[in-house]
């Protein structure tokens, strides 16, 4: 029996393919404002204002589509949560660039294009939520039960090696299970021949949870975790630029924070502590002191909810992440990056290295002021939490890219506004 992949018919590919939606949205975001401002004959004459405005609007919308589409690759990145920030950031950057370069443009047309872009994104989102919820066929072998708790996917558990007349986006199976043999293997081959993707259960689990299991990492998987050296070089340049801009920008806030800390409690304003960074090398991290003096005189320990060592000023600056602003100096020195796994104390590193397999591998990249584990999982309060946090860190290393870093920046802003994960 031949199978068909979901949305594989020609009209479905046209209606639901990202390129088609990008092109249609871009035409609406460019042409509708132009028609309203200059009428039907706007294309008959192109002066500098029209070229700059319409060309800029097209590029801004195109980048919006690319960014939101890339975000969809990562768990918990619903487009509706980042739609307004993404569109606003890109159109705002366009206006800033045109203003800085002193190029003529129409503010009215750009504003209307911005509104149309938002509406287009909303329409595409609702169409996608209605018609593009993934539908996966799941084979009843291995550890498949946890996957079925993820409601963002429509699961169909197969009881025989046959899809019937139902069309699916993909087939998911534990390809290493010993019971997967005979008719089931031939069934997977037929699915592949019908251009229906066949995914290993671990691959789908990582995509849905944002975690890479670390209990049984094989040598070939470690190879896939190697971060891109090209992006690492580019990322370092962006880190330096961001630190050079952020340090003078936040200097008044850092000065005010230092004064408040000094007025509230005795002791130094800064909290200096050795942490473990890239290559398992120690460095000294800079933070504003948020706890009472000598808070770790009995040794390193995790901060807890309602920790009595935290001062009143400390509670505020921890919630808003102001205590971490001095770490921009660590970024400038090369000890840290803006985005990466959070650095731990040597005491904890040695302990976790004994308890958690492959723990040291997280030191293959620079630690960050913010990171995937912080914005998804929050603060790690014990060894079990740390194990989950490490799985998030491995996911970040495996998916080391500009798009994931941009998503983490957006999530970090949300984290600061909500106080998620603060102790």
UniProtKB/Swiss-Prot annotation:
GO terms for biological process: O antigen biosynthetic process. The chain crosses the membrane at residues 14-34, 48-68, 80-100, 108-128, 240-260. Coiled coil: none annotated. GO terms for cellular component: membrane. Its EC number is 2.7.8.40. Residues 1-13, 69-79, 129-239 are extracellular. Pathway: Bacterial outer membrane biogenesis; LPS O-antigen biosynthesis. Residues 35-47, 101-107, 261-423 are cytoplasmic. Keywords: Lipopolysaccharide biosynthesis, Membrane, Transferase, Transmembrane, Transmembrane helix. It comes from the Bacteria. GO terms for molecular function: phosphotransferase activity, for other substituted phosphate groups. Pfam families: Bac_transf. It is found in: Membrane. It is a multi-pass membrane protein. InterPro entries: Bact_transf (IPR003362), EPS_sugar_tfrase (IPR017475). It catalyses: di-trans,octa-cis-undecaprenyl phosphate + UDP-N-acetyl-alpha-D-galactosamine = N-acetyl-alpha-D-galactosaminyl-di-trans,octa-cis-undecaprenyl diphosphate + UMP. Transfers N-acetyl-galactosamine (GalNAc) to undecaprenyl phosphate, a step in the assembly of the repeating-unit of the O-antigen. Shows no activity with UDP-N-acetyl-alpha-D-glucosamine. Belongs to the bacterial sugar transferase family. This is UDP-N-acetylgalactosamine-undecaprenyl-phosphate N-acetylgalactosaminephosphotransferase. It comes from Aeromonas hydrophila. The gene is wecA.
């Amino acid at each position: 029996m031949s199978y068909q992949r979901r949305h594989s018919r020609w009209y479905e590919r046209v209606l639901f393919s990202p390129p088609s939606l990008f092109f249609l949205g871009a035409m609406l975001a460019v042409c509708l404002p132009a028609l309203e401002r200059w009428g039907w004959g706007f294309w008959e004459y192109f002066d500098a204002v029209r070229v700059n405005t319409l060309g800029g609007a097209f590029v801004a919308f195109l980048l919006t589509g690319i960014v939101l589409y890339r975000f969809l690759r990562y768990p918990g990145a619903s487009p509706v949560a980042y739609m307004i920030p993404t569109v606003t950031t890109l159109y705002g950057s366009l206006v800033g660039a045109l203003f800085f370069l002193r190029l003529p443009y129409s503010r009215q047309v750009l504003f209307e294009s911005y509104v149309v872009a938002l509406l287009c994104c909303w329409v595409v989102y609702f169409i996608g939520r209605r018609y593009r919820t993934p539908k996966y066929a799941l084979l009843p072998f291995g550890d498949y039960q946890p996957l079925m708790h993820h409601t963002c996917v429509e699961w169909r558990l197969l009881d025989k090696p046959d899809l019937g007349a139902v069309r699916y986006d993909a087939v998911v199976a534990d390809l290493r299970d010993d019971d997967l043999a005979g008719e089931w293997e031939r069934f997977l081959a037929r699915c592949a021949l019908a251009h229906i993707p066949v995914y290993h259960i671990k691959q789908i689990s990582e995509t849905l949870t944002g975690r890479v299991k670390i209990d049984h990492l094989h040598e070939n998987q470690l190879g896939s975790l190697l971060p891109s050296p090209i992006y690492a070089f580019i990322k370092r340049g962006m880190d330096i630029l961001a630190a050079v801009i952020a340090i003078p920008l936040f200097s008044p806030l850092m000065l005010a924070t230092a004064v408040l800390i000094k007025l509230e409690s005795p002791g130094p304003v800064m909290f200096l502590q050795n942490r473990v960074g890239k290559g398992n090398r120690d460095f000294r991290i800079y933070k504003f002191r948020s706890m009472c003096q000598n808070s770790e005189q009995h040794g390193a320990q995790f901060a807890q909810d309602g920790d009595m060592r935290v001062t009143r000023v400390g509670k505020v600056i921890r919630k808003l992440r102001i205590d971490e602003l001095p770490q921009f100096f660590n970024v400038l020195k090369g000890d840290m990056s803006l985005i990466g796994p959070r650095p731990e104390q040597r005491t904890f590193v040695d302990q976790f290295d004994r308890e958690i397999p492959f723990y040291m591998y997280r030191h293959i990249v620079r630690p960050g002021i913010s990171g995937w584990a912080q914005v998804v999982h929050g603060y790690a309060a014990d060894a079990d939490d740390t194990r989950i946090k490490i799985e998030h860190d491995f996911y970040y290393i495996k998916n080391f890219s500009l798009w994931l870093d941009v998503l983490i920046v957006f999530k970090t802003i949300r984290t600061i506004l909500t106080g998620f994960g603060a102790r």
